[in-house]
Structure formats: structure tokens, C-alpha cells
């Protein structure tokens, strides 16, 4: 795309688009994670085991979220991404509100599946739009800002879910967080503009050219060794993160006799503020050090994960609630370093017409490893530990969890080693 023919996108439009997408992603995580603060009252009301609650909070959502993300990303590489995001937002918000009507495990599972189907259309489209708005040197920072929707959404979900459930019951919590997303979808449709594809890189996708299939994109990515290690490391990091986020509220309720309001407030702060700082710091440090040595785009994550391991172990061994929260803030912060740079490097590894599908392939790996298996595995381990540790079964289940980050750190180290060569092979396809 020549400078003369390329339309000018103002900084105001870039910032507005990024800002709206952050708000959308915030609602994405409010609705995704609201169940984690409601596990205990739903378990008692509907008579569901820890393993069953793990399936509801993770697997029921994540299987459909992960698998449908790729075909919907294929749509995003062909269709208006703004419209797909707005429609997806309306679907998942409506299904969140309907979760409040569930009377048994299966009805709640259907509602969670609906949330997963709706949310599958969000991030691949958003990543593709932001990659078209921001050049490579700013992309990790932009995607880190977008990823702030994760800790902000979790924080507000914890705050609102705990307080509303204590005051009005768990069903009302679903209604209150679901309905505003329907209104936000109208804002997306009416005010967000679709950017030209390849704009930030001075490229123009050939719209007459046949789009690559999901299989072709996946085959392209797996020939890049940096992607294989990056996706594996990201999946393992997500495995730790989703298991922790899902079960930490229940741990503090059971181990420290906190109310839902108290657990929601304190964990909202810990998951929100250190988590947000970790996302921003990870993106900024990756851009800063990666500009000097490409390997450090991902080696920054390696260092962060190694430091997180002892902090996580200590957090679940202490007997004082405030010290546990303080120690937990460090692995929460460091465990979020991967967010911006992981997705930014995948956007850099993918040609223009593959970007939305490439993001979806990565999301599939992250969510299949992390969200499909993470929450139910913690619950299953907790159920298995009951005979040995009784009331501390969940404590020791979560204690073991953090050590998986050692495995994740190895893959980020290897990914950084291969990254420069793989980026150099990317053509303007």
C-alpha cells in the first residue's frame, strides 16, 4: 500500500478503537470469570462437586470457546471485524444473564456453552484490528493495553459477584453483569470503525486472493519453531493462571472463613491491580529489550515465570490471610507478563491475511490447555486430596499448581531463541 493511496487514521481514532476494545474485553472477562466467585453458593444450592464446578467454570465454556474461535476468526479475515465483535458481545452477554435461571448442572452448562460460543468471536477479531492499527514496534504495548481487560474484568467480576451474591443471591449476580454488555454492543456497532487490513505495516492484502484455510494457517505456524514453543509455553502459563483464578476465591472462603464479599474484594484487588501491572510491564519490557535483542521479546517472560514459582508456593503454605494475598500478588503480576508479547509475536509471525486466524489458533492452544483442563484438574486434585488433607485439600492442590510455570519458562526460552529467524521468514502474503 503506497503512502499516497493509504488512508490516514488519526491517533484519536486509534486510541478510541483501542479504548472501546478494552471495555469490550473487560466485559468478556467479567462474564467469563463471574462463576469463580460464585462456586461455593452454586455448589451448595445445586449439589455439585468440586470437579463438577471445575467443568462448569472451565471445560463447558472453554471447549466451545477454543474450537469455534478458529472458524469465527476465518470469518473475521473475510468479513467486517467490528460487526463480528458487536454480535459476539451481544450473544455472550445474553447467555450470561440467562445463567441466572439455571436450576441444575446441565442447564448451567448450556448457558456456559453459550457464553463460550459468543466470546469466541471477540479476541481474534480484536487482535487483527489492533495489528492493523499499530506497527510492530508498538504492537506488544497496544495488545498489552487491550489485555488490561483481563485483570479489570476479573476485578470487577469479583467485586460485583461477591457483593451481589451476598446481598441478593448468586442468580442476581449473573443478571447484573450480563445486561450492560447488551448495551455496549450497540456502542460498538455505531461508533467503532473497521481499519484497512495491513495498514500499520504499509501492506495491503489482496482481497481477490483466496484466503488460507484454518488448516493452511495452522500448518504455516507449526513450521515456525518459535510458534510451537511460544504456544506451548503460553498454554502452560494459562493452565496455571486459569486454575488459580478459578479456585483462589473458594480457597480463601474455605481456608480463612471469608464471606463472598470479602473474598471478592481482596482477590479483586490482587487479581486486578498486580495483574494489570504485570500485563503492562510485560509488554513494555518486552518492547524495550526486544528492540535491542529479538530474543528478549520472549525471554522477559522466561525470567518472570521463574521468579513466580517460589512466590506461588509460599502463598499457599502460610496461615495468615493477608500474607497469603501479599505473596499471591507476585505470581499474579509475573504470570501476566506473557499476555501482550505472546500475541504480538504471533501477529508478527503471520502474514496479513492470516492474522485473525493465527490469533485464534494461539487462543485455541492457550484455552484448550489452560481453560479446558486447568479448572477441572484443580477440582479433581482437590477431591482426591480430601482423604489426606481434609479441609486443606484445595490448599495443597493449588500449592502444586505453580510449579508448572517451570515447564512454561523452558518453552519461552526456546521460543526466544528461534524468534528472530522465524520473523525474518515472514513475507507480505
What residue ranges belong to the model's regions?
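Helix-loop-helix hairpin linking two adjacent transmembrane segments in secondary transporters
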Residues: 146-194
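Cytoplasmic helix-loop-helix junction between adjacent transmembrane helices
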Residues: 111-151
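Juxtamembrane intracellular "pre-TM" segments in multi-pass secondary transporters
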Residues: 3-10, 198-231, 255
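Extracellular/periplasmic helix-loop-helix junction of adjacent transmembrane segments
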Residues: 38-67
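Helix-breaking motifs and short loop linkers at transmembrane-helix boundaries and internal kinks
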Residues: 47, 80, 101-107, 135, ...
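Conserved MFS/SLC helix-loop-helix module at the cytosolic interface between two early adjacent transmembrane helices
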Residues: 67-103
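Multi-pass alpha-helical transporter architecture, strongest
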Residues: 187-191, 311, 315-316, 399-429
Amino acid at each position: 500500500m503506497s503512502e499516497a493511496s493509504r488512508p490516514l487514521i488519526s491517533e484519536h481514532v486509534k486510541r478510541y478503537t483501542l479504548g472501546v476494545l478494552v471495555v469490550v474485553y473487560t466485559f468478556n472477562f467479567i462474564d467469563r470469570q463471574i462463576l469463580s466467585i460464585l462456586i461455593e453458593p452454586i455448589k451448595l444450592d445445586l449439589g455439585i462437586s468440586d470437579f463438577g464446578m471445575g467443568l462448569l467454570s472451565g471445560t463447558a465454556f472453554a471447549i466451545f470457546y477454543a474450537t469455534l474461535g478458529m472458524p469465527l476468526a476465518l470469518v473475521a479475515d473475510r468479513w467486517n471485524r467490528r460487526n463480528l465483535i458487536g454480535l459476539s458481545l451481544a450473544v455472550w452477554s445474553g447467555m450470561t444473564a440467562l445463567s441466572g435461571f439455571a436450576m441444575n448442572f446441565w442447564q448451567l452448562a448450556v448457558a456456559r456453552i453459550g457464553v463460550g460460543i459468543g466470546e469466541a468471536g471477540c479476541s481474534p477479531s480484536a487482535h487483527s484490528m489492533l495489528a492493523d492499527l499499530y506497527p510492530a514496534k508498538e504492537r506488544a504495548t497496544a495488545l498489552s493495553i487491550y489485555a488490561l481487560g483481563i485483570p479489570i474484568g476479573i476485578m470487577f467480576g469479583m467485586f460485583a459477584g461477591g457483593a451481589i451474591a451476598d446481598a441478593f443471591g448468586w442468580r442476581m449476580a449473573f443478571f447484573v453483569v450480563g445486561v450492560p454488555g447488551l448495551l455496549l454492543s450497540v456502542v460498538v456497532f455505531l461508533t467503532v470503525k473497521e481499519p484497512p487490513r495491513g495498514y500499520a505495516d504499509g501492506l495491503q492484502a489482496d482481497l481477490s486472493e483466496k484466503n488460507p484455510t484454518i488448516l493452511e494457517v495452522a500448518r504455516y505456524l507449526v513450521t515456525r519453531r518459535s510458534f510451537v514453543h511460544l504456544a506451548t509455553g503460553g498454554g502452560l502459563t494459562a493452565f496455571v493462571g486459569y486454575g488459580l483464578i478459578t479456585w483462589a476465591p473458594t480457597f480463601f472462603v474455605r481456608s480463612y472463613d471469608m464471606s463472598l464479599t470479602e473474598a471478592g474484594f481482596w482477590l479483586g484487588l490482587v487479581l486486578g491491580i498486580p495483574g494489570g501491572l504485570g500485563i503492562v510491564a510485560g509488554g513494555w519490557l518486552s518492547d524495550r529489550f526486544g528492540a535491542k535483542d529479538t530474543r528478549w521479546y520472549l525471554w522477559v517472560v522466561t525470567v518472570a515465570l521463574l521468579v513466580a514459582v517460589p512466590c506461588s508456593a509460599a502463598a499457599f503454605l502460610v496461615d495468615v490471610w493477608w500474607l497469603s494475598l501479599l505473596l499471591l500478588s507476585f505470581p499474579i503480576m509475573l504470570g501476566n507478563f506473557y499476555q501482550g508479547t505472546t500475541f504480538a509475536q504471533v501477529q508478527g509471525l503471520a502474514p496479513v491475511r492470516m492474522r485473525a486466524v493465527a490469533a485464534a489458533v494461539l487462543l485455541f492452544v492457550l484455552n484448550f490447555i489452560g481453560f479446558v483442563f486447568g479448572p477441572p484438574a484443580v477440582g479433581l486434585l482437590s477431591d482426591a486430596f480430601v482423604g489426606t488433607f481434609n479441609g486443606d485439600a484445595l490448599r495443597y492442590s493449588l500449592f502444586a499448581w505453580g510449579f508448572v510455570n517451570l515447564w512454561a519458562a523452558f518453552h519461552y526460552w526456546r521460543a526466544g531463541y528461534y524468534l528472530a529467524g522465524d520473523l525474518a521468514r515472514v513475507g507480505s502474503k
